Structure formats: structure tokens, C-alpha cells
Amino acid sequence: LGMHGRVAGSHLTSMHSMDNYYFSKLIGLMVEAEMNIIPNPLINITIQGKHDTYPKRRGMTRVPEQIKAGLNVAFGHDCVLDPWYPLGSHDMLEVAHMALHVAHLTGQNEMKSCFDSVTSTSAQVLHLDKYGLKKGCNGDLVILQCNNKIEALRLKPTRLFVIKKGNIISSAEPTEYQ
């Protein structure tokens, strides 16, 4: 069908409950199909297992194994102020922050990967050709008050500037930290 690399599986919560044997067969097929993965950490851990007795399922797909297999993992956030997740805020740094906790991705490289999963990897999954800061790109970016990807997730920094097509559309004063 010519769909390699152009198909994404969203949520994939059932993979959390699969035994290792079944999962090992399925992930091989996903890699062969060059499938993209879009877990939705905030909603997945809120709804999945909600009505279970103990032990309760966490409900987020097997992100570490999917990344290790070479699949593109781009975190999503599809429920905002609705009956399924009334706490949604459209804040993708919040999504990545939750994902690294739920998926046990707290190593240095894993945390950087979580940041990428809401930035560059997401753009790759969406086939956004003009993403980035190279000549010819749209010039869409957010400037954060932090020094690196890990601080972006750890500190929940002030968004100093939001820039769209090279124009500042929002700005904020820096936060003074004690």
C-alpha cells in the first residue's frame, strides 16, 4: 500500500497489558511497517485501569521498548477540558514530564528523548518539512527560560517568547529564581 512511515498508532494502551511474548511479535511487525507511535500519557493513565481493582493497570503503552526498537515515539495530548480529562492544558512540556515518570524514562538520554517526543520527533511523525531553525523553515519556535532539554522538563520554565512565522505572538517576563 505504500504506507510505510505514514501510519501512526495512537494511545496503544492495550500494549501495556500484553505479555512479553505477544508484544515481541507485535513490535517486530510495527518496526517492519515503520509505524509511528503516539502515546497520550495524561489521558492514558487517567482512564486506563480506572475501574480496575488492585493491581491497577497504568495504561500507557511500552514506550521504552518502542524507542529501543527504533520506532518514532511522539507524545500526544488529545483530551482538553472534556469529560475524559478535565485537566488538559495543551502544554506539551507537561505531557513529556508525565511521560518520563510513567514510562520510567529518567536517565539523561531518556529525558532528552522525552523532550524530542514533543518537539522534533513529533514534527517528523507529522511530516512537517519546514520544522526547525534552518534557512527556509517557518521560524516557529518557543524560547524557554532554561539551559537545556532536561531543565525544560524539570523546571517547567517560563515561555519567554512564542514565535510564529518569525513574528513574536506572545512574550513573558523572565521568572526570578531564588
Q: Positions of the model-derived regions?
A:
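Active-site core of metal-dependent hydrolases
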Residues: 1-59
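Active-site proximal loops enriched in glycine and acidic residues that flank catalytic Cys/His/Asp
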Residues: 11-13, 39-42, 75-79, 137, ...
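C-terminal cap of metal-dependent C-N hydrolases
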Residues: 124, 135-178
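Glycine/Thr-rich phosphate-binding loops of Rossmann-like dinucleotide-binding domains
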Residues: 17-18, 47, 109, 152, ...
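His/Asp/Glu-enriched, well-ordered alpha-helical/loop segment
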Residues: 5-6, 47, 57-144
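Conserved strand-to-helix beginnings and helix N-cap segments that scaffold or border functional pockets
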Residues: 20-24, 86-89, 156
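Short, solvent-exposed amphipathic alpha-helical segments in soluble enzyme
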Residues: 25-26, 54, 90-92, 159-160
